Every structure is written in C-alpha cells, then in structure tokens.
Amino acid sequence: MKSFAHEIHGMPVHAIDGEIGTIQDVLFDPESWTVRYLEVSTGWLFGRDVLIPVDKVKRIDAPDGVATFDCTKEQIENSPNAEPERAIDRDYESRLVSHYGLAPYWAAPPEAGVPPQAMPIGAPAQVPETAEELRLLSGGEIDGYDLDAQGETVGTVRDVLIDLDTWKVSSLMADLGGIFSQDVETIGVGPVVGVDRENGIVNVSTSPEKMGHGTGEKLPFVFPYVPPLA
C-alpha cells in the first residue's frame, strides 16, 4: 500500500500497551530513498517528540487511521533524546537502534551463505570512527524544495509517496504549474541526481521539456494539508 507522507500525518500511534501519540513526520535517506524513522509526538504523555525506527512498525491500518508499533510505552519513554541543536548523526542513531534491539541498517550485509549475527537487546551498535551526519530528510523539510531540471527550475516539491510495505520512497509529489495550480504530478525518484539541502533544491536529469509529459498520475491536491481531527 502506498501513501503520501501528509496522509499519515496526525495518525494515532498505538504501542503494545496503549496509545502514545500521533505521527508528525517521516525521516528518509535521500540516497537510498528509504524511510528510516517516524517522528511521533507524544504530547501530554511524555511531552516530547521521539523518533521510532520503521522496523518497529507492526502495521498501519489506513482505513481505521491507526499505526501500531511493536514496542511498549516504557521503551518509547526511555528512548534516547535527540539534541535539537545537533544534526542526527551516527552516534545518536546507534544509541537509538540499540535501545530498540535492532541492527544498524548501515552495517555491511553478511556474506553469501553466512547468516547474520543476532544482536542482543541493548547491545551497542557499531559506530564509525567519525560521527558523520546522517543527512536524513523529513517530509516536512522537502516540502517547498525547488525542482530543478538540468539547471532550470520547473516546479516545487510538495510531498513524497511511500510504499508502506517496504518503506521505500517511490515518487515525489511536485507542483509543476505554479503557486495557484490545482494539479500536481508524481515523479519517480529514478531521475533524481542530487538533493541540495543548503539551497533547498532537488535536481533531476530529465529535460525541462519532458517534465509534466511523463506517465505521472494527475492528483487533486490541496495545500497546505490540514490533518483530520482526532
């Protein structure tokens, strides 16, 4: 099942032992186009936003509008705090995945025929010698990025389309018709050749002339998105 990031914004999140908050955003790797974490607002419960690895998502029931996580309230309450003044780096992510008993996704895959080693819950994940920035993007951050086709600005990125079974970002939702446009188009991430976070630009290899003339599905879109009331 596929969903735009804005469609799961505000969705209630249930832990094993009860409701914990609502989904606020998705964080994805713009190189592999894979969602790594969901940002969850715990509101009155714990009073902070937390990042939870998508590997802990048990299911997302779109018809009922509920996301169920395979972890407890206590696990979420005791999860490592992200420091607002620091970028998310390998050190923080290492502590986060270790807290949830997960293997780091950046670890090298096992050799063919050799089963991966199980990682005990609470065991420290391996951290590179330098704590490089993870360079994750959020759905909220990429909203508003310019879409640049071979040096020409052709539109504005509005959202990402996510496969909720694989957590892969398959397409970008882009407004190619200006601020007053009522139509947007989905553009596959295949032609994306780079994401310039400093200047807020997504670069694609497609020529400006071909933008808007592909197989992208025309979709009704209202901006800004207002999540349904809980």
Which residue ranges define each predicted feature?
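Peripheral interaction segments used for macromolecular assembly
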Residues: 1-230
